[in-house]
Amino acid sequence: MMHKERIWDIKEYNSQMADYLAEELNISPMVTGILLERGLQDAASMRDFLYGSAAPFHDPFLLKDMQRSVERIERALAAGEQITVYGDYDVDGISASSLLYLYLKQRGGRVATYIPQRKSEGYGLNDEALKNIAEKGTTLVITVDCGISGLREVANAPKSLDIIITDHHTVPEVLPPAYAIINAKQRDCGYPFKDLSGVGIAFKLCQALEQREPGRLPEWQGLTELAALGTVADIVPLIGENRELVRRGLKAMETTKLVGLRALIKASGCPETGIASDNIGFGLAPRLNAVGRLEHAQLAVELLVTDDSVKAEKIAAELNRENALRQEISRQIMEEAEAQLAQEKHIDTAIVLASEGWHQGVIGIVASRLVDKYHLPTILISLNNGVAKGSCRSIPALNLYEAIDAERDLLTQYGGHHQAAGLTLPAELLPEFKRRFREYVAQKLRPEDYLPHQAIDCVLSGSSEISIRDLEQLALLEPCGCENQAPVFAFRQALLHNQRAMGKERNHLQFVLDKGYNSYRGLMWNNADLLPYMFENMVADVAFQPKINVWNNETSVQLQAVSIHQQVTLGDMRQAADDKWRLLLGLAKVHNKVLAYTEDKQSLPAEVLQTAGDYLELASYEEAAGMSKERLQQAEEIVLLDLPAYPLADIMRRLRQQGAKHVTLLFNQPDLQERLQRLALTHPDRDAMMQAYKLVMNALKMRTTVSIKELLSAHAEQISEQAVKIMEELGFIRYNNGIIEKAAIKRCSLEDAPLYVTLQQERERLEHIYKENYRLSQHELLRC
């Protein structure tokens, strides 16, 4: 399988309005243009978005069951009851557990945290844990980032426990019989913002508790960095309350009093000032996640809540080691998953792979990478002692929770979001689950849903220069993330050179981009596999996020490419195509759908067609002009099997305009020789006409007539019907109904035969096309 190139969705905005608003707000039109694209249409809404509003947070008591929850917690604090915060092992759950623990501690509460062990306990509430918690004296359990799917566990919990569920996951039809449930997604909950993370819900609980203590600085204001940590890591929309939480939290991180967070920032190599959402997503969150995936997330909670700097540094170093190990395990599983994919038959709806020994805590990361690469819903499953535990990731068009819910009769446990989920089922039911899941996906999605898209905020003109000043202005859009993506720009017809692989695994692409009078260094993460399709000084359209890069105390603009549209990626196998049928079958095996253009669809050997099966579709070059974009874009690979009788540059241009992405040339030197030999026969020159004349006259010496069929059968490589027709035009013979008769001989010139003149002109044209099609270099073809 080959990864799919993204379709660009180029946004547009009113440039005059952008200029007007930019002047009113005293910011760059580049920023106001992007905000116009994103639905903000006036200066007031833009000002609130960029700088924050005076009252950014909704009343927490608008959340259903908040009043009941606060009253129960207040009673527990007043009576000195033991409270346990029951969390989850991802960053959202870790930060939510830490935030609520620290807040309740500051309020004088007797509080503990409990994070289930991923491998042995799995996600969410479990009977044994609740039993043990109760036996240790806890009377109030507050869940964070989990619990909404724990119907059975809450029902079976010890009667001595009151359970308050705070969660943000999809709400099931039947709710657990908990003391209270705080989840903005409940059907009868009137809270106006539905996209809070788990830590966001915990934050709202702290807000509500603070409103009972007026007249003092709210304790939660000192914990916004934890709210930012989980909100960014859980990839919830960074709009509304989430945006304000993250904005405040990122600022608070620079001067945080949380010694564990300071140690983590230092260990991860993040800057101590100017911390951005990217630093959480790529620096802090992976380290917190790693310990939860490989060992026990309780260690991450200990880091975030400790006030011991020595202990914090020790745990941060341990998290670094766990993260390095997680990266290695991820690489190994990715390789094994790719190997399985290579053995699978036709995969066009969803990827479902399983293996003994795959680390349950890491398969979700690999599933995400497979989705990024192939743009197919993906489930990776770890098999252990007859139990199959899977991590699921989706594409935007598929609601993954609904897709898995449709197979709930096969599952022992499941839960999740629109785009990510987890599940458990008996291993023996895996084949049935795989079949039904793929059928569900096939019924729900259309062909166009499988095509990845890339939003482009602005296509820059050739004279545009991206400056440090521009990037400082774009920083006003931070924090960026889900539903407030970092802006993406594009250059058309940029020149790329000095391409090479970089990184420890040599899996990243580095290049230099020239546009107009400006030159930029660029990179593209995890895309070194594009190198075989690239060449020095190639022309391409490049979509990118501009970043400030500091190296050796020098500051420059660096382009982080997210999509490169080479005019068409071209595989040139003309010099290596001695066995074109073997190569064609190889391409059909690698790609889900190969469309092969050929001069004669009947010329392919039957065994090739049989072996390729549904992977291979044939089309004549004559069909190419009328082929729909939809049909063409369904093919992952276009193969030019025979030397075409049309200019190859025109074919490449048409394929590019129709949206073809990958083209392979399979015609070779023998094809060229065969075409020229056939031209010599079907478009005879003077020497060929003299030879044909002698053959006909010799045949007519023995009898008065001769059959054209008989003549061609005896001399197939020396004479053609066109030569006979030319002789008829010159009056040398009479030719009717396939029978040749001798006529009176008269002196004349070959040029007196219109057919001869036409054929010579056509021969000259076709010879030039054939030779030029074979001669044109890959570089020249891609510049067409």
Predicted regions and their residues:
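Acidic, two-metal ion nucleic-acid-processing modules in DNA metabolism proteins
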Residues: 105, 110, 243-338, 394-412, ...
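Active-site cavity-forming subdomains of large catalytic enzyme subunits
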Residues: 131-199, 203-212, 222, 239
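Conserved RecA-like helicase motor core of SF1/SF2 enzymes
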Residues: 629-675
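Hydrophobic helix-and-loop "lid/oligomerization" segment in the mid-to-C-terminal part
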Residues: 2-3, 13-140, 159-160, 177, ...
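Short, ordered loop/turn segments at secondary-structure junctions
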Residues: 88-89, 116-119, 146-147, 168-171, ...
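Acidic beta-strand-to-loop metal/phosphate-binding motif
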Residues: 84-86, 138-146, 597, 636-643
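Short alpha-helices
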Residues: 99, 177-214, 220-232, 654, ...
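A short acidic, amphipathic alpha-helical/loop segment
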Residues: 152-156, 351, 366, 607-608, ...
